[in-house]
């Protein structure tokens, strides 16, 4: 290392560190044009003072669902002062009262009383305001499945979707955001008959798309020549392994800090590898924490075996949860989609092909994450 390669104490590799923050919303949103256009079309009636179309955004973690909502909401707010948009994180606001309180705060700028007010009264206050002010409300329920877990999904959805029947002039649209459509198993026929969403799919990013997106973050987040194409491709490979673009953005940030700590002007392979070792369990545990309780129970059963046949696994799962095969089958497919398990078919079963299921991570790592979840 020459003198020119050494980073001085008052120098930094980062041109704009905010570009590498998880909540950064880029001006340009590559490889999601069709999804953004579908959202814009669904929300277009709201700009004319009408109820928008309901939507369901479906895709694995880190595929741009929440960012697409935030970008579209910004556009709507900039062009339609009569439209109020609210994004609810259902991991945090997982009860009907918490959801309605979030909407109330967005409308009135203050929180409702913590006690002494019923859900129905809070809801009436919200809807009466919408009607009297002639505003359109669009509510995005991020991680909607958490309302299912808590048993509040049907009442929240039913109240919002049928508000116009009880309160003429109320105009409310609902956007559900889930990792898999099967997450909405809890919605009953009353809700499904009025939800009827436009489904917008967010598939995993492909290798070339990941590279494009991370190159943009590098261009605006770092000074020139801080990271080589070869090192960036290593970051891309880790994103492919996890299936979560947020992993790549976080790795760029951590790798930059590692290089600065060593006083280098460039990020090396070892900086990325060290960053991944330090953060991979954080990403794994974060993902597992988002699973429903039955999914966590199923993953634990799988992790406690080197590999297990689907029939044997279902028997153990049913004894533990009393859930049926349809739910079990959907959860196995979801865990496979999320890259937590392999569930390959083999021809060695008594009746032909059967599924052999095993974890894609070290079992100990998964079990440790489940303990923290």
Curated annotation (Swiss-Prot):
InterPro entries: AAA_16, Cdc6_C, Cdc6_lid, ORC1/CDC6, Orc1/Cdc6_arc, P-loop_NTPase, WH-like_DNA-bd_sf, WH_DNA-bd_sf. Keywords: ATP-binding, DNA replication, Nucleotide-binding. The keyword Nucleotide-binding applies. The keyword ATP-binding applies. Pfam families: AAA_16, Cdc6_C, Cdc6_lid. It comes from the Archaea. GO terms for biological process: DNA replication. ATP binds at residues 63-67, 205, 217. GO terms for molecular function: ATP binding. Belongs to the CDC6/cdc18 family. Involved in regulation of DNA replication. HAMAP family: ORC1_type_DNA_replic_protein. This is ORC1-type DNA replication protein 2.
């Amino acid at each position: 290392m020459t003198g020119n390669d050494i980073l001085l104490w008052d120098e930094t590799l980062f041109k704009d560190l905010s570009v590498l923050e998880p909540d950064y919303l880029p001006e340009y949103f590559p490889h999601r044009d069709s999804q953004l256009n579908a959202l814009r079309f669904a929300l277009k009636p709201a700009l004319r003072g009408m109820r928008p179309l309901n939507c369901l955004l479906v895709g694995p973690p880190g595929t741009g669902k929440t960012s697409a909502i935030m970008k579209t909401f910004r556009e709507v707010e900039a062009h339609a002062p009569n439209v109020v948009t609210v994004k609810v994180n259902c991991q945090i606001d997982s009860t009907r009262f918490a959801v309605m309180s979030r909407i109330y705060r967005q409308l009135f700028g203050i929180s409702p009383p913590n006690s002494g007010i019923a859900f129905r009264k809070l809801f009436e206050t919200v809807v009466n305001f919408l009607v009297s002010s002639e505003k359109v409300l669009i509510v995005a329920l991020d991680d909607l499945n958490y309302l299912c877990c808590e048993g509040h999904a049907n009442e929240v959805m039913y109240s919002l979707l049928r508000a116009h029947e009880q309160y003429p002039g109320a105009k409310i649209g609902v956007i559900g955001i889930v990792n898999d459509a099967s997450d909405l198993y809890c919605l009953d026929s009353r809700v499904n008959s009025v939800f009827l969403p436009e489904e917008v799919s967010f598939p995993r990013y492909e290798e070339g798309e990941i590279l494009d997106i991370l190159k943009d973050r590098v261009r605006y987040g770092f000074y020139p020549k801080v990271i080589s194409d070869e090192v960036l491709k290593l970051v891309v490979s880790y994103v492919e392994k996890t299936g979560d673009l947020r992993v790549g953005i976080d790795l760029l940030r951590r790798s930059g800090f590692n290089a600065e700590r060593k006083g280098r002007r460039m990020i090396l392979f070892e900086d990325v590898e060290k960053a991944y070792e330090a953060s991979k369990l954080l990403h794994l545990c974060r993902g597992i924490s988002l699973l429903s309780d039955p999914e966590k129970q199923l993953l634990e059963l799988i992790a406690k075996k080197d590999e297990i046949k689907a029939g044997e696994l279902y028997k153990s799962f049913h004894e533990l949860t009393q859930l049926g095969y349809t739910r079990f089958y959907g959860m196995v497919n979801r865990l496979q989609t999320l890259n937590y398990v392999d569930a390959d078919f083999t021809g060695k079963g008594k009746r032909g092909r059967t599924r052999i299921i095993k974890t894609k991570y070290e079992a100990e790592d998964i079990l440790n994450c489940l303990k923290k979840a």
